[in-house]
């Protein structure tokens, strides 16, 4: 095993996660239709602070992320500070690491705590797929800039005359990789074919995710970590995630057609995460600061790792790459884990990563390691369901997973939990959590 890297401050304090909260997650254009991500972020941070009863001045830093950014609010973190009654002097900045954005936010706050520049901070993320930055064509954008510089009406009219009808059409945000033009679903199809993952296996994982998420809500396990949202026109509260299909059957999944490779594909809307709106955040502190305030931490951040691979082929292998690093830095193995929570971008991606974590050949030939990371024990894996069921507001998913895993660890009497995710751009993230 490689070098263990303890996550402690200069005084030897562990990094404590004292509280976490999220909004219910909503499918695109449903409960949060028209609510921008910045307002979702304000909603969850304001409620998180109110529930924790931590004085606003105790929070010295807020690091927040948004993947689909709005031009009018480029620093969502600062807008949240200014819009929630937090101390105006609170340091705030925004981060983006695609689907691992709130993993990055947590890591950044942890690094500030370890450096000793702060003693308490908030990390999280929010995204809205219902309020999108609809742009204009490149040609129209260039003409508009030139028109602004033109001095006479005739010059302006001449510039506009260069435009054609198609140049005036609105341009939605890109859903494909900038460097390759591949959509995430195209990559999921690649992975299904590369690793021999069948449609039946994908549908079974998706069904499992929905069944377990529905059971978690039914058992009341999520009530403490999901706030009630009140949104215009305030006719009724929004209480639970609205994507979960608790009454579905495997036969229902089999009815859907492939969404990306129409002829030979196996990836469908049902075995993929839907476009989703929501926000999530966690409060981190040094262990000694939590004790001073009389707070009992949910748990501790034991280690983290970020990785990057090529984007042209099977780029959603982040968990298979980042997990061994995070475990190594924590001084643990897969068998030491009580829980494993992997982001389910697609069932195909999830199953491919599970396969490679247990592959000796992948470990030797690709990772350059002597042995496989370890088999994933199904009894420990995504025990409350995953992103296919809950949905995936890109920047919020990591904070959801961290909070959910820590609560479940505490229900089980403590232990170690792994949270891990793939992300666009061939990125990967993994964190090891500890609860007592």
Swiss-Prot record:
Keywords: Acyltransferase, Cytoplasm, Fatty acid metabolism, Lipid degradation, Lipid metabolism, Transferase
Source species, domain of life: Bacteria
GO molecular function ontology, one term from the record: acetyl-CoA C-acyltransferase activity
EC number in record: 2.3.1.16
Catalytic activity of the protein: an acyl-CoA + acetyl-CoA = a 3-oxoacyl-CoA + CoA
Any single biological process term in GO: fatty acid beta-oxidation
Subcellular location: Cytoplasm
Transmembrane segment boundaries: none
Catalytic residues, chain numbering: 99, 392, 422
Database matches in CDD domains: thiolase (cd00751)
Pathway stated in the Swiss-Prot or TrEMBL entry: Lipid metabolism; fatty acid beta-oxidation
InterPro entries referenced in this protein's UniProt entry, alphabetically: Ac-CoA_C-AcTrfase_FadI, Thiolase, Thiolase-like, Thiolase_acyl_enz_int_AS, Thiolase_AS, Thiolase_C, Thiolase_CS, Thiolase_N
Primary location recorded for the protein, binned into one broad class: cytoplasm
Pfam families: Thiolase_C, Thiolase_N
GO cellular component, as recorded: cytosol
Signal sequence segment: none
Subunit structure: Heterotetramer of two alpha chains (FadJ) and two beta chains (FadI).
Protein family (similarity comment): Belongs to the thiolase-like superfamily. Thiolase family.
PANTHER family hit by this protein: ACETYL-COA ACETYLTRANSFERASE, CYTOSOLIC, ACETYL-COA C-ACYLTRANSFERASE
Function (record text): Catalyzes the final step of fatty acid oxidation in which acetyl-CoA is released and the CoA ester of a fatty acid two carbons shorter is formed.
Name assigned to this protein: 3-ketoacyl-CoA thiolase
Gene name of this polypeptide: fadI
